[in-house]
Every structure is written in C-alpha cells, then in structure tokens.
C-alpha cells in the first residue's frame, strides 16, 4: 500500500483564498425543488452521494449515474433518502461542480475496507475516474465522510480507514483525475460522544497533509446546544467539536468546508421544532413546539452564520441540505434515525430571504 509520497501535488491552503462556496443538496428531489423555486442564491456546487462498494453493481451502480461501461444512465436510485445520480447532479442543473459523499462504510459491506486496501476494488476506483472525466467543474470528494461517527461501521479501524483513503487518492491521481479535491470530513457530532461515552482524538484518522485538500465537518445543532437527557459523561458542545476541526485546519494550513448543514428537528414549512432523539432530548418527533420565523432563525441559522463570520480566515464553503427529511423513509416515521424535520428553504419565504442576504454578505461583503 502506498504511503505518503514526495511527488504529490500540493494541497490547497487558506492562503490560496478560494472563493466562498455555497453548495446545495443532498438528493435530486431536494436540488430540483431549490433550483426550480429561484428562492435563494445559485450554488457553486451540488451534493450527491455514492456507495463505493456498489459502483459496479447493476441494481444501482452505487448512485454513480453511469453503467459499468461508463455510459450515462437514466436511473435515479433511491436508498429511502431521495433519488440520487451523481452524473445527473453534475449535468442537469448547469452547475458545473459537485461535492460527493463517498460512503465506504461496512454497514452493508462487512470486511470490505480491508479488501479495498488490498486492491480488490481498484476497478471501482477507476470507475470514479471515468465519472470525474465527464464533470466539467471541480469534484469535492468526501472520502469516508463522518469517519468518527459511531453509525459508520468499519471506520473505527483507523488504519484501515487511512489506508483506504490513501489508496483512493493515489489511484485517482495516477489516472490523472485533475479536477478532484480531497475532503477529510469528521462529524463533529455530540451524539457520537453520547453513543461512545467518550471523545476520540480525530487526528487518529488523519491520512496526512499530502492527501487532504479540505478539512470538513457537519453542522446540525445550535452551536451551544446541550442535552436535556441526563448523561454521566460530560459532553462538549457542537461549537467545541467544530473548533477542534478548525484548530487542526489552521495548524495544517487547510481550508474548511461545512460539508453537511441543516436545521435538525426544525420544520420550516410548519414552523415547528420537536425532539430529535431519545439519547439527546426525548422521544423523536415528540414535544412539538410552534415557532415564529424569528425563533427558527435564532435557533439555528443565526448561530451558523455567526460561526462562519467568526472564522472567515479558514471556512470557505458551506453545503446546505435542502430536504424534506420527514417525507423520506430513512428519516421519517417511526424516526429510527431521529427526527429531522423539513429544511427546504423554498417553503418559507422569510427564512429564504434572510438566508439569501446572509450568504451574500458572507461571500462578498465582509472581507
């Protein structure tokens, strides 16, 4: 297995001052709703998800959107979380760039990370290169995203994760996939610490500076939210976990992306909030509260934009998830994965207008 090499191209750095990117996702239905509504800023990139180990499987081709011979197909596969096709995401909307969440989890693929490291899935990596050659803009490849999340089986073997990540990068670079930037994304999720009853050192998953163009994390809660369920473990706040990523990024001169951002447990259409999870605040979907738009804004959007402004030196991209989570089987009743709500901006004119103004200020007015 190849390790760090001295001949790799340099990674991006904050000093390169990349433009500030708004990314929208995370499935084709969500993107179509956002784009058709003209409610909000035009994104610089769109989000898609790919199941790496199924890339050559005829049932769904891993959501890649091309078949085994590299030809685009009309199939939009749905894993109960909205229709996906990375090819369509990159070509249907006139937005040239794409952020891809590349799943390497062993939840449905036990033992396959070690096989990836051994070279058993080099054909799947080649198929990624085939797709990327068809994409006119940048590909932000989030390899094994949320590596520290307890829900992602297999990543707990840090060496397997690192070697798998490196093999994918080395292979794509050897195939001259020049439009790819590599994203190392932690979850920064307090609920992971609740599950684990401890806080891991995320640096244990770091594949090395030569393999990372961006660092990233997810943002779903209020920055200073705390659990209302009694727990013996003293939990950090979402802000503290995000700060941990930013500290690493500054130390390693990497730009940062909020790779998944959504107002968890808020419903922008119905103007409500409810419990997310029994391990955090109570039975999922219960304790519903009616809110004003101002309360919704202050409950999630304002803290996120404040965090972006406070860290302008290092955060250069944010990917908003514009989805009706509650209508998707993976996230809807009976809420086995928690209550997520409805984060579609186009269903709430006031929130959409304020979001548009804040994105413009973050991108253009505050430097």
Regions found by a protein language model. Name each.
Residues 5-7:
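Bacterial signal peptide processing site
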Residues 9-121, 230, 263-266, 278-293, ...:
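N-terminal substrate-binding region of glycoside hydrolase catalytic domains
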Residues 12-37, 50-51, 139, 255-367:
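Substrate-binding cleft of secreted/luminal carbohydrate-active enzymes
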Residues 21, 43-47, 95-101, 138-142, ...:
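Structural preference for beta-strand elements that scaffold enzyme active sites
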Residues 34-41, 81-99, 127-136, 204-210, ...:
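Acidic (Asp/Glu)-rich catalytic clusters
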Residues 56-186, 289-295, 342-347, 354, ...:
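Substrate-binding cleft of extracellular glycoside hydrolase catalytic domains
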Residues 74-90, 94-97, 220-271:
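Glycoside hydrolase catalytic-domain groove-lining segments
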Residues 170-199, 253-267, 315-325:
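Aromatic-lined carbohydrate-recognition surfaces of secreted/lumenal glycan-active proteins
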């Amino acid at each position: 297995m190849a390790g760090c090499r001295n001949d790799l191209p340099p990674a991006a750095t904050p000093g390169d001052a990349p433009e500030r990117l708004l990314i929208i996702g995370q499935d084709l239905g969500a993107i179509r709703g956002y784009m058709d509504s003209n409610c909000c800023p035009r994104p610089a990139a769109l989000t898609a998800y790919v199941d790496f180990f199924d890339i050559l499987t005829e049932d769904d081709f891993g959501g890649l959107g091309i078949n085994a011979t590299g030809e685009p197909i009309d199939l939009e596969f749905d894993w109960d979380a909205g229709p996906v096709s990375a090819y369509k995401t990159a070509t249907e909307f006139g937005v040239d760039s794409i952020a891809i969440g590349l799943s390497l989890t062993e939840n449905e693929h036990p033992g396959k990370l070690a096989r990836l490291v051994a070279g058993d899935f080099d054909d799947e990596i080649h198929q990624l290169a085939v797709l990327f050659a068809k994409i006119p803009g940048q590909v932000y490849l989030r390899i094994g995203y949320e590596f520290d999340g307890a829900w992602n089986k297999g990543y707990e073997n840090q060496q397997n994760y690192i070697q798998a990540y490196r093999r994918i990068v080395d292979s794509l670079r050897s195939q001259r996939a020049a439009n790819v930037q590599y994203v190392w994304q932690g979850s920064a999720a307090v609920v992971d610490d609740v599950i684990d009853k401890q806080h891991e050192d995320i640096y244990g998953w770091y594949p090395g500076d030569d393999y990372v163009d961006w660092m990233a994390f997810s943002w779903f809660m209020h920055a200073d939210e705390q659990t209302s369920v009694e727990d013996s473990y003293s939990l950090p706040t979402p802000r503290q976990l995000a700060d941990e990523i930013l500290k690493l990024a500054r130390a390693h001169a990497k730009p940062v992306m909020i790779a998944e951002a959504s107002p968890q447990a808020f419903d922008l259409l119905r103007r409500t909030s409810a419990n997310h999870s029994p391990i955090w605040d109570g039975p999922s979907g219960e304790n519903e509260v009616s809110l004003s738009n101002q309360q919704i804004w202050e409950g999630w959007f304002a803290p996120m934009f404040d965090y972006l402004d406070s860290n302008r030196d290092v955060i250069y991209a944010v990917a908003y998830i514009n989805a009706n989570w509650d209508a998707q089987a993976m996230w809807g009743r009976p809420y086995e994965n928690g209550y997520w709500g409805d984060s579609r901006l186009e269903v709430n004119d006031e929130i959409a207008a304020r979001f548009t103004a804040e994105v413009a200020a973050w991108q253009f007015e505050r430097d």
